């Protein structure tokens, strides 16, 4: 059909893992369902977003983030409307999805910190890319990416952990449905990061501090490596992703 179009869609890379000095996993990736919109297939973006608010239970923060990303995203890029959809979100959208050409639910990778508060002050966390960060990042390198390191090792080693996006050339119809794949360059996962922190010593230090306010730092005097770094009160980094 003359209305079919060839487009290049970015494929975001998975983030590199973070380990302690002995190979214990401290920062992991896992798949979640997200609602995304293709700029190339939606003519009335504001109207579409307004109609999706009650269906996907969008917050004002969701709307603001989406609007910020739309301004800088490539024409062929799929932009996240909401990450980590609930079963209820998915069920409600499935009933009306044909009324939203260009909007679909897809699987994306997000971050998970298996030890919660224990390494929060060391690892930090990732979060949605904000306006200030959008102005600084390389648009090509972050095409299709929603998360970026905010504090801690996640931020300090962002360039190492991020990876390189891939691209997929597809033929799509006027509604944005992919008819066939024409070629693909796979994304490259970010590099893994091994910290000097020792899981065992970190656990002992946290138990010693218990619920008291304060901090404990253990340093190897021979090398200067930090083996444990605990601060109380702590926080659950998973709540910020």
PLM regions: where:
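Short hydrophobic alpha-helical segments used for membrane anchoring or interfacial signaling
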Residues: 216-221
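Extracellular/periplasmic solute-recognition and catalytic clefts
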Residues: 227
């Amino acid at each position: 059909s003359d209305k079919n179009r060839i487009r290049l869609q970015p494929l975001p890379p998975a983030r590199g893992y973070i380990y302690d000095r002995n190979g214990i996993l401290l920062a992991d990736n896992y798949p979640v369902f997200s609602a995304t919109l293709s700029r190339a297939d939606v003519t009335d973006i504001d109207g579409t977003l307004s109609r999706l608010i009650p269906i996907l239970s969008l917050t004002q923060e969701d709307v603001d983030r989406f609007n910020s990303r739309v301004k800088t995203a490539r024409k062929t890029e799929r932009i996240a409307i909401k990450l980590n959809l609930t079963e209820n979100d998915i069920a409600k959208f499935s009933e009306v999805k044909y009324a939203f050409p260009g909007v679909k639910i897809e699987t994306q990778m997000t971050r998970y910190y298996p030890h919660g508060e224990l390494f929060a002050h060391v690892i930090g966390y990732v979060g949605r890319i904000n306006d200030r960060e959008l102005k600084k990042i390389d648009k090509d390198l972050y095409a299709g990416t929603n998360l970026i390191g905010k504090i801690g090792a996640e931020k300090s080693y962002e360039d190492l952990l991020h990876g390189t996006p891939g691209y997929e050339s597809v033929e799509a119809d006027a509604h944005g449905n992919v008819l066939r794949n024409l070629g693909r360059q796979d994304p490259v996962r970010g590099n893994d990061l091994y910290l000097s922190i020792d899981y065992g010593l970190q656990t002992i230090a946290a138990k010693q501090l218990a619920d008291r306010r304060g901090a404990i730092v253990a340093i190897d005097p021979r090398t200067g490596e930090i083996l444990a770094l605990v601060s109380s009160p702590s926080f659950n980094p998973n709540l910020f992703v």
